[in-house]
Amino acid sequence: MSSSLQDNYIKKESLYGAQNYSPLSVVIEQGEGAYLWDVDGNKYLDMVSAYSAVSHGHSHPELIKTLQSQSTKLAITSRAFYTEPFATFLEKLSNISGFESVLTMNTGAEAVETSIKAARRWGYFSKGIPEDNAEIIVANGNFHGRTTTIVSFSSDSSYKDGFGPFTPGFKTADYCGSCHCGSIENCLSIESLSLIHISEPTRLGMISYAVFCLK
């Protein structure tokens, strides 16, 4: 439903922006709940109601109210200071998830990269794996982001072509929710001392990544 106005914005983005996405030919201007409006006033039903882990609807009134209230007091600060909202957030997230502590990240890719670091460090310091010998089991067909280390364990060549050399230390297993297929167990039977499993547990919803240490 492209118009001359939308075409102008699309051409401008194509001219000045990196061509790393292939969006629909619609220029969105406003959103409310599950609905979107383009610059020509056409209305759309957004079937995902925003994006990925923030699919709580567009311009949710309670979120807007909270954002406006907080921005009048403190819009941004570094972790060099303690803040009440962050402490309260950590407590609530810990209670909801059932985990003892929380480490927040800006993006999913950051969460995965940090999970890799946590898994390897646990392997070396707690499990006694020899230095530089840790291996992590990843699911075949995974998508965890586009950073160099993350695409290193992707099984999709379109994410890897032209970006090597890749980070070593990963073993791929077919994903099996019940683990009855034996894929992970087969990986463990190869070198059971040095394997750690990273996955994205669906039961946590908006909480990104967790590390599961296989004993």
Task: Label each region the model flagged.
Residues D38, D46, E110-E113, H144, ...:
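Acidic active-site catalytic centers that drive phospho-/nucleotidyl reactions
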Residues S2, Q6, G33, H60, ...:
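Generic structural signal for well-ordered, non-membrane alpha-helical segments
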Residues K73, S178-C179, C213:
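Active-site/binding-pocket entry motifs
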Residues L15, K43-I129:
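Glycine-rich loop-to-alpha-helix module at the N-terminal edge of alpha/beta enzyme cores
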Residues E91-L195:
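PLP-dependent aspartate aminotransferase-fold enzymes
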Residues V26-M47:
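Active-site and channel-lining beta-strand-loop segments
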Residues I196-K215:
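Single conserved hydrophobic/aromatic residue that forms the stacking wall/gate
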Residues M1-E32, A80:
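Active-site-adjacent loop/helix segments that line or gate small-molecule/cofactor pockets in enzymes
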